[in-house]
Amino acid sequence: MLNGLSIRSLPVIFGRPEAPVTDGGRIVLPAGEFAQIANGEEARFIAYLEFLVGEGRSRGNHVHARRAEALYVVRGRLRARWADVASGEREEQVLKGGDLVHVAPGLAHAYEALEYTQAIEFSATPFDPLDVTPYRF
């Protein structure tokens, strides 16, 4: 795995948990699902993302020099690509609903829907358009 990249599938608990969920998890109850994506992390940027299937609909394709980001896939599947711009090392994986990805500064990233997908992106750093450099995969 690339340095500065972490991918984790949040654990799923069916019914009320015996102990509090403090490190992320999905609790499925008759009334619906509760997903604790982060606990104790500061978020100064939060965005909802919808990914539609189709040629040329890849999102991202850029790198940030200063900003770390997290992406939580609510539902669907994405082909994710990352590249360490300093070393040239690359990685590709398929993300699915319940996956949580942390991307460090200096890692280019791109996401393409394999099926209709919804996700939430968050960061401790506000969005700065001057910290977005296009990257061609």
Describe each model-derived feature in a short phrase:
Residues 51, 65-84, 122:
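Short, conserved beta-strand element in jelly-roll/cupin
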Residues 85-105:
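Short acidic-glycine-tyrosine-enriched beta hairpin
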Residues 110-137:
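Double-stranded beta-helix
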Residues 52-56, 97-98, 104-106, 116:
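Tight coil/turn sites that cap or link beta-strands
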Residues 1-45:
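A short, N-terminal "cap"/entry segment at the start of jelly-roll beta-barrel domains
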Residues 77-79, 100, 118:
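Structural motif
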Residues 47-67:
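Conserved short histidine dyad/triad with adjacent acidic residue
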Residues 68-73, 93, 101, 110-111:
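His/acidic/aromatic-lined binding-pocket segments of jelly-roll/cupin-type domains
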